[in-house]
Amino acid sequence: MAAEVVVVVARGEGVTPETRLRAPQGEFEVRRLPATHAPNLRAWDAADEYVLRHVATVDPDTDRQWVVVNDTFGALAVALAGCRPVAISDSVVSQQATRANLALHRCADDSVQLLSSLDAPPARIDALIVKVPRTLALLEHQLHRLRPSLHEGSVVLGAGMTKTIHTSTLDLFQRLVGPTSTTRAVKKARLITSTVDPATADAGPAPGPSSYRLATGEQIVCHASVFSAGRIDQGTALLLEHLPT
């Protein structure tokens, strides 16, 4: 009697994750960084797909100054590289992923300008796409910095999954940009559309970074979105106690 052979395959093993983004702008190879073999993890989400479909209906004037904010792995930057956008992110990993994905398409080094959230944005922004971050403080910081560059003709879009878009999110766009509405959900993703209101140009000062002084005398400055911004966390406190002076 022949022996029975049982083959056990680990979950996800041998399955290639989806890396082909299909959008009205074309088809693009977009990969996560670091690389993953999990088939359910892509370098983009339904909100990226949604906003790219919407952008395809906007005047594709390449003379517009496009700005993309919080593009996790560069999917939007790659798809819109022909518009030579500025990509703003607070993540070094995001910037490295964007460079790697642009290189896959042999895009020129200057096809997308990469800036951090602390860098000065372009003086004029004609089209703005903001992927809504999980941290409301980061969104507020970013909108405050971007608002002076917007004008009445600017196209302003927010994009995110339904779990990241709340009433407080819409209120922030309304207060810092202008009249705001949201679209119906598609594959659990929504878009936010805002019309720039000149009255919001004077929305008040941006919230500054918080700071405090340690018992040892060091001054700690915490920018928006950093972990444990209000106080030093226990792990860091323990580490500092044992660092050589």
Residue ranges and their predicted role:
Residues 5, 12-22, 134-215:
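N-terminal auxiliary segments of SAM/dcSAM-dependent transferases
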Residues 34-58, 187-245:
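SAM-dependent Rossmann-like transferase core, predominantly class I methyltransferases
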Residues 61-73, 245:
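Conserved class I S-adenosyl-L-methionine
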Residues 73-83:
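Conserved SAM-binding loop of SAM-dependent methyltransferases across substrates and taxa
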Residues 85-90:
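Conserved SAM-binding motif I beta-strand of class I
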Residues 98-99:
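Conserved SAM-binding loop
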Residues 107-117:
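Conserved SAM-binding strand-loop segment of SAM-dependent methyltransferases
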Residues 118-127:
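A short acidic, Gly/Pro-enriched loop at the edge of an enzyme's catalytic core
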